[in-house]
A protein has these predicted regions:
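A structural preference for short, hydrophobic beta-strand core positions in alpha/beta folds
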Residues: 74, 140, 175-177
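Catalytic His-Asp segment of secreted/periplasmic serine-dependent ester chemistry enzymes
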Residues: 147-234
Length: 234
């Protein structure tokens, strides 16, 4: 009995230890999420448009200048991981009922998280969004190779490949390949696309990202109507 009680006690402690990181992560981002909500109360963003979520690549993205003809909402919070966007999906996605959600996350996971786990976290994000918004399209921007994390490039590419395969199984999902777009003649990341930290993008880097993403955001033009037959041809 004593041994059993000890085992139960240890199990309880382990469960508590596992629960702490999730709560700590929620607390870590609470100020950022609360700031979004406060801004919404002052000026409510439009519904049914495009929401961008994810880490600092999203946060630093000047969406208004990148897509002046589109209505976009930036809900990026720097340093976040894929699981964080899922954790707050009811506060940073669902309230806006977007037609498209653009996701960039995984840069901060890749150092310590297996590629397979990043894919699982993205799948959870998709399920969380579609549970409330089944018609919303989700566009995942592939994790970009970077100078800072070039040593992890194989893990980046594995995660991207698996997420692409997942997206190909659902018409509501899309995948943007960033790999070739940021590499130079030597097949390494082009230095001019990254700021001094070797991770975040320069304005030129964002120009490339804009060009990659835009085709997925702009509705396809309606097919032209067939010309009416002239009286001479009747």
């Amino acid at each position: 009995m004593i041994r059993r009680r000890c085992r139960l006690g240890l199990s309880s402690l382990l469960a508590l230890a596992c629960a702490v990181p999730a709560a700590a992560q929620t607390d870590r981002w609470e100020k950022d999420i609360a700031a979004f909500e406060a801004a919404d109360r002052i000026s409510a963003p439009p519904k049914g448009e495009i929401v961008f979520v994810g880490s600092s690549t999203i946060r630093f993205w000047d969406l208004a200048n990148a897509f002046p003809d589109l209505k976009t909402i930036n809900r990026g919070f720097g340093g976040s991981e894929m699981a964080d966007s899922t954790r707050f999906v009811d506060r940073i996605v669902v309230p806006y009922s977007p037609r498209i959600v653009v996701v960039y996350a995984g840069d901060n996971d890749i150092m310590y998280t297996p590629s397979e786990e990043i894919v699982i976290q993205f799948e959870r994000f998709v399920r969380a969004v579609h549970a409330k918004l089944p018609d919303t399209k989700i566009l995942y921007i592939g994790i970009k190779p970077s100078l800072l994390r070039w040593a992890q490039v194989d893990r980046v590419r594995l995660a991207n490949a698996m997420i692409r395969q997942f997206c190909e199984r659902d018409d509501r999902l899309g995948f943007v390949d960033t790999d070739n777009a940021v590499l130079g003649w030597d097949e390494k990341p082009r230095k001019e696309l990254y700021v001094s930290d070797g991770l975040h993008l320069t304005p030129l880097g964002y120009q490339i990202l804009n060009a990659l993403v835009r085709p997925y955001l702009v509705p396809a033009p309606a097919p032209a109507a067939a010309p009416a037959a002239s009286s001479a041809s009747r």
